[in-house]
């Protein structure tokens, strides 16, 4: 027998992984030597859990039962049980607990009664039970049970509270506090803040068991904590050697059949420190696994994944010592972080018969997700792991995670949807089903049940949501990419990489690169021309899927300036620091022109269809205009042109007729010529490729004839509603520089004969 020890809460603080609440663990009365010895063995030794039992007091009319608020031995998981496994509580079962860390009491927490204790009927000591609930480290409890309305038979006999300390959560006393234990989320029910007097168990004779004595705790204090177990890729030991001298050793098992898909990492029973002395019977084996039933368990989402191994130990202890089963009922347990734990012993790769779905335990395996998923979706990490385990187990027996199968009912019953089952008759089931599909329960909760189609899709394949996310080394234009040759294609998929066997990069429908399923990019070298690029994913099931096609053009030919850059004077305001001009060009590309950049004397970028731009240049200064054309693939071509604007004052012209000189700071050089005499003329001679006549304009300005190289080129009207100075009003350009003459002649317009000229600008 294990020595009895009572733990009174104070002091040492432990750390457990996420963020939030300090949890103070109890101080044991063990000696330093005892503690040191247990700490040395903690990494390899199983953890023995404590179970404490207290009978509920039933009301005279049989319609309610309770357990008064009281101090308890430390526990983290609880449930209510009763004598007849076939009996039901049709009303409600609720408990409230006191936090060992804060001393605060929770609100009333419901305990699920929709389980069937007949799962392993025929065994001695099998009891009816509620679903166990994880409440975290606690040292006080109160329970109330009410029969449902119209319940004629009242409550089941032998109502009893079972509390479980899964061990492994207490830190031995040391010289200083150990560390902080951190809870990931608060409990679902808020603390009430009040703490009425609690009733010690020994002071309430009416609460003592009437149908069976409450056994004296016979477990040692929990072993010291250890880091959360890591999933192992090695097969867990099929079963541990029993620690009791009367138990027969489990024979060495041959491996189960290979699966069509990889085995996911699984934390073995040894790693979660299962107390194998609880489960001394040999496991029962099935002929195979035809279907998987998904469950939820522990009735809370407010747990830290660092506590998951302790929760599994608590479930194991509860199923054996409270339900009276031979072992943990589920074949696999998954926490919200996606860690998979080995459940019932016998070998994870063997078809071990569990105790999870009454009437359909044969030919099936049970996977339970720790949490409550009635209204809350299970985490993606959890559903991913459920899908991986289901695919692996079904793959051992050529099952289809997306398919259906006939299962023979092992007992009369019904499911949540109202379908009835008759023992010995076969019924169709999805090969991944929820507990509610085989039994009248909400399990695995409406939200998790609604996630089963997505779980089937993950497990069965193919890879979904496959798209090309990027083409590095190429430039996109619309839906087409352009590259010189080398690219790296990146992709993404909604299916997690753990289900992907591999990816292939296809060019023109042929693979050019093959990578593993956790790789999301691959390089390729393309020949010149247009190519269709895709990614093909192979699911672990062997099913394939293709991404949409991406068009990639490989192009090594540079763009061409079909029209070289050229400069021409334009109309506008002229000053001694800026002469208006136009820069013209035309660039083309065999594939796709991206842009043309002006790099000097200023930086500008123009679109592929732009062929001219307005600029200014400083007079009397040679300026180089440099341009580079870029295509979509990154090929380039450069071209340039140089020009010098020159201002010829009116005094540089050959005069004809009558002209007067006008002075003003508004004129180029401070002076201009004006004439109202018909036929008066000015002639400039220059060598250049563009010319612009500069004038002053006003409402009274008249007209002039313009002659170029002796030929009349235009009649120009200088009239303007607003007075303007230094206006280039007329321009003329040639393809190359040459000697030219420009002559202006006063028309003598009626009513406004005068005109004022401010010189000529030419470009050389």
Indicate residue ranges for each PLM-predicted region.
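Short beta-strand segments within Ig-like beta-sandwich modules, predominantly Fibronectin type-III
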Residues: 511-518, 603-611
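Glycan-recognition surfaces in beta-rich domains, encompassing non-catalytic CBMs
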Residues: 40-131, 135-138, 146-147, 155, ...
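Long non-globular sequence segments
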Residues: 2-257, 554
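Basic/polar, cationic surfaces and motifs that engage anionic cell-wall
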Residues: 2-7, 23-24, 159-220, 224-293, ...
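Acidic, Ser/Thr
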Residues: 491-496, 584-590
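Surface-exposed loop/turn motifs at beta-strand-loop junctions within extracellular Ig-like
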Residues: 147-149, 438, 495, 537-541, ...
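Solvent-exposed loop segments of extracellular immunoglobulin-like
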Residues: 499-503, 592-596
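Solvent-exposed segments in extracellular or luminal domains encompassing
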Residues: 520-528, 613-621
